[in-house]
Amino acid sequence: MKRKWGLVRIGILSFWGALLLSIALAAPSQAHWADLAVANVEVGNTTTHITLTFPTGLVATADDNRNGTLSPAEVRAHQTELTTFLGDRIYLTDGNGDRGTLTVAPSDTTVLPPDQQVTAGTHSTLKLSYTWLKPVQGLTLHYDLFLPGVPTARCLTTINAPGQTQSVIFSPESKEADLMQNAPWYFAGGIPLAIAGCFVWGAMHAMSPGHGKTIVGAYLVGAHATPQHAVFLGLTTTITHTAGVFALGLGTLFFSQYVLPERLYPWLSFISGLIVVDIGLRQLISRLRQNRVAAKAARSHQHDDHSHTHEPSEHTRDVAHVHAQAAPHTHTHAEQTHNHHDHSHDRHNHSHEHPQLHTHDHGDGHVHSHALPGSDGAPVTWRSLLALGISGGMVPCPSALVMLLSAIALGRVGFGLLMVLVFSLGLAGTLTALGLMLVSARHLFERLPTNVRLARLVPAVSALVITLLGVGISTQAVMQIGLFKPFGTFG
Amino acid sequence: MESSHGVGQATLKRLRKVPLLVLSIAGLLLTIPIGLKVWTEFDRAKLAAPYRYEFERPSPGSVTQKLEQEIAFYQDRIRRDPDGGMNRALLAKVYIKMARATGETSWYLLGEQTAQESLVKLPFSNDGALMALARVATAKHDFQEAIRLSQKATPNEDTLAVQVTTNLAIGKVKDADQAADRLVAQNPDLAALTLQALVAVSQGQEQKALQAFQQGLAAEEPEETGSSVWARTVLGRLYFKRGQLEMAEKLYQEVLRVLPQYPPAVLNLAELEVRRGNYRAAETLYNKIFLTSQRSPTVYDHIVFRGMARVKELQGDPKSANEWRDRAEARLRLDLVAFGHRRELARLLLERGRPQDLTEALSLMEQEVKVRRDAETMDTLAWVLSRMGRWQEAQTAMQEALRWGIRDAALFQRAGTIAQTLGNTAQAETFFKAAQATDPTFDEQAQKALGLGVGLLGLN
């Protein structure tokens, strides 16, 4: 039971952590003192008492003298309607779903002299007692006493059960919680719901800004990627992200006396940005070269000892190219340029097809992939995909880190790790789906006439975008680190 | 077949490269924290030794966790002794500590409810409950009520501390001074000495203030994290007000090293960034406050809204600035009665600069000065009056603001402007010189950050 409670606590904490950290730019709450309520719950065997201080405006009709505070006389005079009103909004059910019988009484504090009632005039305090005929197990508290039209109204509640004290905040979004002896709070549905929630959260979180979506998008569109590449990229991001959260979480714990985790983020961003710049630059250089070559080849030129046919229209996966002679020539594969001077194509014409993915060995141990040579001759390489995936997942989401640290703080390391993994899978699901969509969409572009000059420029432009994004990420990180301050500052 | 063999070999080759990559990343992840540790220590070395927090800083969340443990402890004792009042008073005190640690207003309400229950159970000699109510009243800016409640309790360190704070707020600086001296005589701890320093600042006795801060920090104990961060925050703001931005920044950073989410330090750091013209950095800091305050409303929300409005305006986005001001205004209006935010609302209306708001701003300030007359409040009144062209009355208000000798460049600047308008050129010149002497870097950019910080010149 304790274990279950611990797991559920992690779920609750994670939920809050996620909420806190994932909506950085969300509109802040607008609740104010007059909307706030507080309650103290004393859990007993057959009777549970709630001392509730709430905005009197919620029961304005019972405030006969309109002084903003319910007096004992007013409570007695409106006993029935108060009981009905409050019983509909705040009730406790036992494990069988039976509601406790509610009685409402004025609080003892009304006997205090007015000068000791600081909130008099805005709030009233009542004692609510819920009674069952026999001892109960598995209590659930339902709280729905909020001012209408105030979505951010809150009720801070402390719950005291034997040997256990907890505080919880009810809100219009969180009106219900299970209260059990020795296992006070958990949301209905328990662990499976927590895991499912984590997956959905991760998936939704991936839609928020960041996570290298733009870079990945630019890469997949610019390069001739396949669905497998998109999946590989998604998986790499997941694995790196999960590993990053684990490493950072453990690092944070280990170095918590010395380093604030938030100071690590800019450094990781910086490294991530550098990787992206590297990828972008390599692609850019490679594609510019190929554009040049393609432009020449388009004229169907003839060299002294061998000819290449590089009609732009043949720059598809079905392209057949002819090596008429064994002269040294260059293949450029996006990330690396290698010379074929160490292996030969002995005076043979070979015409090979390039299905979606294949590698071939030239017999010298030099395996190279002709994964989808594109019209620009810049195929997607696994190395670049790996680097891109790592750069995308390298900076762990603070939300995931909070989730892990909350779990560790509660001693539920295993469950925390599982939740981080599920979160990352959700994240990867979205990223992969986006990647697949982009890859599918790219085929639409392929159907366009490829001899259009603009179409040849697309890969180079995408590489340039990647490079600029990388520069942007790195610069922002450097500024966050504080190594560089913008001009115009003083002090 | 040959093709699948090739694929297998290729995959193997790629996999061989993976450990190297993983090792490099792991190495980086380990090297960065160590590097940062060195960096942090190097950075901290620039902070004068007495201002450094030399104890082990609390692990993340441990401050509130400890308070939660205290709450559980007293709740358990209340269960064992349901008719007792003493444990409820102590519990109320912990709730108020929680309110101060988190800034969440709900804890004040819970503290009040519990203190009242305590007084029902123990109507006499219940100083703890009375002082808990006095603390709630202070938080709500009901200073007269706070003084009255504290006077009903037997004089002790708690009552003296409340008296220092409340007397400062209502402009009775001499009474605050006496209370602070008695407090320090009774228990010269960091909290008491910080209060004494604040009283000294309000009288322009900076050396005495610095001495009190240093003495307090020298007497610092590891168990008083709240006082440790508060003292450094207000000391940082004192340096900020003197134009020593580097020192202020170091102190705020030291606070955030101890308590990474401490709202006053985050807000003051944002104020500092606005003054430096680093609006993006300020915005990031305000967003950091939102991250931690989504759970429940806090007493700092309106400052954050105003700060965001200022930043947006300075970034050339008047539409967003207005939206943030609307939020701040809505919040301040709703809390006007409960938390006495009349002064803040008046300042917001003045910042908006709409002529039609001036009458309301004046009305608010006329109400406010009935209960609060610290330097900042009187300065705000002078601001309203001068905007309305009532320069003579503005001068009277400024004179009251400066009567205890407080040294603040912004106040001197306003006093100078008022004197100049009234034709007292020599006096105006004296004020402008005093402003420059107080803060040699006080310029147009510095004025853009006015009123965004927390602490030092009275409660926000």
Question: What are the language-model segments listed below?
Answer:
Chain B
Residues 90, 132, 162, 195, ...:
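Canonical tetratricopeptide repeat
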Residues 6, 13-128, 139-141, 148, ...:
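N-terminal leader/linker segments that initiate helical-solenoid repeat arrays
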Residues 86, 93, 128, 158, ...:
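Start-of-helix register in tetratricopeptide repeats
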Residues 93, 97-100, 135, 165, ...:
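Residue-level recognition of tetratricopeptide repeat
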Residues 67, 101, 108, 143, ...:
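TPR-repeat structural position
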Residues 98, 102-105, 140, 170, ...:
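Structural motif corresponding to the intra-repeat A-B loop/turn of tetratricopeptide repeats
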